[in-house]
Amino acid sequence: MSDLPSVVFGDGPLRWQELVAVARHGARLELSAAAWARIDNARAIVCRIVANGERAYGISTGLGALCDVLLEGEQLAELSRNTLLSHACGVGEPLRDEQTRAIICAAVANYSQGKSGLDRSLVEGLLALLNHGITPQVPAQGSVGYLTHMAHVGIALLGIGEVSYRGSVVPAAAALAAEGLATVRLGAKDGLCLVNGTPCMTGLACLALDDAQRLAQWADVIGAMSFEALRGQLAAFDAEIVALKPHPGMQRVAANLRALLAGSQVLENARGIRTQDALSIRSIPQIHGACRDQLAHAARQIETELNSATDNPLLLGTPEAYRVVSQANPHGESVAMAADLLAIAVAELGGVAERRLDRLVNPLVSGLPAFLVGKPGVNSGMMITQYVAASLAGENRQLAQPAVVDNFVTSALQEDHLSLGTSAALKLGRALENLRRILAIEYLLAAQAFEVLAPQRFGQGTAAAWGILRERVPAYDTDRWLAPDIASAAAILGERKSLARLAASIGDLQ
């Protein structure tokens, strides 16, 4: 599926970037021998419990509010199958393939801890889905934290439901048969293991980290272009001044801005034209930097969850000396809070970008042609793109409202506090897509302002960014259909290669 090297889970701490390599870029996923040994050990504990006829939640009892109902014999496998079927009740549009793949990756990471007790054939089945390009169709809505999304993945292992396969949506059984894969046989606890834990929110949050990290860098680049187009006063980014407020993110952003703007004749010619700039351009290090610090915090929280055992119950010890512990590790409060916090940062990045681009089209403050076009009146220019950005920024303010505090009660009072972590991760993904489009609009407007200010020399990095955009989007001379221009700019912001080219132009981009 990919030329990337295989990713191996199980021999050490996982990085969120490894999950992204598999889910988004198609790297093959494997488990280490040590991980398989842990999985087999936990399964042996389950088999011992069943053989001894012991009472253990989810192994020999019903689930949730039915935890006091004792089961035995064939009922144990029947419970696992029924768990998947009854929990596969999500609604709405299906997740994108990369989102479902991320969830499966996070589930495999959870099982690699060797504390769940599912049969190794299920883990092999999940790896086969990833490595053979078979992606279950998983409805996006219906999770208060976990359960429904992985149930839809689980039924695909049974040959039930639909999957994305070779560019089409087909029956799961047909895709498995086409790849020579058998359906799985379920035993005690297998169904519960598949639906339990925090893989849904964690996998989705890892993708969000990838998007947020890339867009935070682009925000610095595009913010620098707007700063230059508005002839900002570079003294605000002075290294000695910035060091007096030693937040790590702020230091990185200011260093980026100085590198991007180095050699700018535009800024040299504009030195001293005003005492100080508007806050939306003067405080880029402070605003972007604070957002980067929240991103760093969220990454630590999400990566810790990726390296956690989040099933219930968890199995400790060996088949000869074991403990079965009911606890609350599937509660995803840490990921939910991290995703909510990051959504606030994303809303701030988009909000300040909208303020900057509004200044670019406003002749009262920009010193540029009204709406960045000749013959205003006949041409509306970039006027309505600012409306679009304002709409997206407004939506992101709504998406910044925390999901984690919206608690409900489920399962007849047994589950009476819920994280809403999957909802938090999904709305974060929507906010990031809005941010990408806001930044794309700012990119278009700043580049158009450069057309006005040329042939003055621009900064080393900002000139490179201008050139990258102009490879796909021509200058705006008269009114034309703008939606494709926004889409083209947004596509650039989604690419790793364009950002790498830009970073190379200045030596590094933090």
PLM feature segments, named:
Residues 2-53, 80-138:
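Glycine-rich, flexible loop motifs
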Residues 54, 69, 253-254:
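Polyanion/phosphate-binding surface patch
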Residues 57-79, 86-109, 137-160, 168-169, ...:
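FAD-binding core of FAD-dependent oxidoreductases
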Residues 35-36, 63-67, 115, 143-144, ...:
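Conserved short loop/turn motifs at secondary-structure junctions
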Residues 2-27, 31-38, 42-50, 76, ...:
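C-terminal auxiliary extensions adjacent to catalytic cores
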